[in-house]
Amino acid sequence: MRYLLIVITFFMGFSSLPAWAMDCYAEHEGGNTVVIGYVPRISIPSDGKKGDKIWQSSEYFMNVFCNNALPGPSPGEEYPSAWANIMMLLASGQDFYNQNSYTFGVTYNGVDYDSTSPLPIAAPVCIDIKGAGTFGNGYKKPAVCSGGPEPQLSVTFPVRVQLYIKLAKNANKVNKKLVLPDEYIALEFKGMSGAGAIEVDKNLTFRIRGLNNIHVLDCFVNVDLEPADGVVDFGKINSRTIKNTSVSETFSVVMTKDPGAACTEQFNILGSFFTTDILSDYSHLDIGNGLLLKIFHNDGTATEFNRFSQFASFSSSSAPSVTAPFRAELSANPAETVVEGPFSKDVILKITYN
């Protein structure tokens, strides 16, 4: 299963640190501390290349709440941090990363962090700590984090998280007999330290589960867009009528089995329209000019941005090519004023296999 990235443009005529204790939860104190991304049975195309993302979870949007910080390495402050995991041992006792077939990681606030290069990610907030450094049993005044006389003893900050798996080598070199642990801690929110398997009961963790559901295929498909340039042009839009009537244009995704591949197995093609821009909800992308973009499947159901849905199914006896038609719709955002002038928006089409 490999991600193929295609850009669709919509046009319209208008260093390692010591470990210090801190509790972190989802949303509020005592909230959830475990988020699991389940890997379904997925398939990797035979032309998969080293570094390709073969699985990516849905995006998780949430607030992280942290408190109960103990004295940290710097007087008066300790940053809640998210680290890519440092190490996990296989049952055989080998270093987890030495399996050399897959790399695990996390996309944190839009930036990828591979497990092979763990780096601290400092949140833009901190907690004042009693008795840190030279301040005895009190707090530094003014407090470092609050900036005032009263210390800041807890923080809440928003995060966007996706978990992923990459190929560490070309698909045709992957060890097909490899057995992995069922669960992997990819991301942990805590004080300035690395993620790990100990003392995580009060540390919010994001985990990948189902690592042995990965299968290498003997086939792959070529993906094309119609129109071929990937531009969906809405032409000129009347700023008055768009307030009451939506406008639509169609495009298609064409998937064709490579004629040189064996293709003896059954597999499905999943697709996701991906964006890092603002979503009004999972089905509506904010264009930024008072309009919203929505994409529909051929059966009339709306797609959800940044989430995968089935585009096609192939088998040894199926037709060599499948076309998936879509309809892109623009409508007025009821909460904003429509701004006249030319605009465009890029959306990335991600293709994967299972």
Swiss-Prot record:
Free-text function comment from the UniProt entry: May be involved in a fimbrial system chaperoned by YqiH and exported by YqiG.
InterPro entries: Adhesion_dom_fimbrial_sf, Adhesion_dom_sf
Similarity field: To E.coli YbgO.
Chain's gene name: yqiI
Protein name: Uncharacterized protein YqiI
UniProt keyword list: Signal
GO cellular component, one term: pilus
Signal peptide stretch: 1-21
GO biological process: cell adhesion; response to methylglyoxal
Keyword Signal: yes
